[in-house]
Amino acid sequence: MSTETMIQDVELAEEALPKTRGPQGSKRRLFLSLFSFLLVAGATALFCLLHFGVIGPQKDELSKDFSLISPLALAVRSSSRIPSDKPVAHVVANPQAEGQLQWLNRRANALLANGVELRDNQLVVPSEGLYLVYSQVLFKGQGCPSNFMLLTHSISRIAVSYQAKVNLLSAIKSPCQRETPQGAKTNPWYEPIYLGGVFQLEKGDRLSAEINLPDYLDLAESGQVYFGIIGL
């Protein structure tokens, strides 16, 4: 029953009652007016509670059908159930290789799957398609030298169609704004560089991730320096 119907019923009830004069009739009209107000207020409150979900069926009690699951959740759930044949690689830096950035795939949290190869410190693309290419390095030093220091990180491609190295991604950072004064306390600094992008690659393309100052690499913790590709 709607609020308007309730009000009409109360008004009809008022008209049906005999018009009593005097204090008793005034009290009756006051009572009916108060009752009408409380009825309207109660109906309004009930509508608000139902509308905003304060009362009624709770979410935990609703059936768990696909209409309540977001499209993104459905996509993630379905993709996790289907084995992927997309090329995937994630290699990590060798902590024992001093003075160079050497990639390893036979380590914890590293992998080569579905045709990707690690050859001559390069990832070899097994099939044509779109790929997410990414890499991260972490530099660490103590104090700032007199000469201006630049740290570079790049991902390059040598394509089958043209045997020339071309930068896909690159970044430059400088950890020092000015030289550390002689005799002053030298403070440690850290500079991470992350690269990532999507590219159309061909079968047989070779990808390399390189830096200019490997002596400043921080290899103390695993997972700080890595390189990988994911077929899309």
From Swiss-Prot:
Coiled coil: none annotated. Keywords: Cell membrane, Cytokine, Disulfide bond, Glycoprotein, Lipoprotein, Membrane, Myristate, Phosphoprotein, Secreted, Signal-anchor, Transmembrane, Transmembrane helix. InterPro entries: TNF (IPR006053), TNF_alpha (IPR002959), TNF_CS (IPR021184), TNF_dom (IPR006052), Tumour_necrosis_fac-like_dom (IPR008983). Residues 1-34 are cytoplasmic. One of its GO terms (cellular component) is cell surface. GO terms for molecular function: cytokine activity; tumor necrosis factor receptor binding. The keyword Transmembrane applies. Disulfide bonds join 144-176. The record marks 33-34, 38-39, 48-51, 75-76 as: Cleavage. Homotrimer. Interacts with SPPL2B. This is Tumor necrosis factor. The lineage of its organism: Eukaryota, Metazoa, Chordata, Craniata, Vertebrata. The gene is TNF.
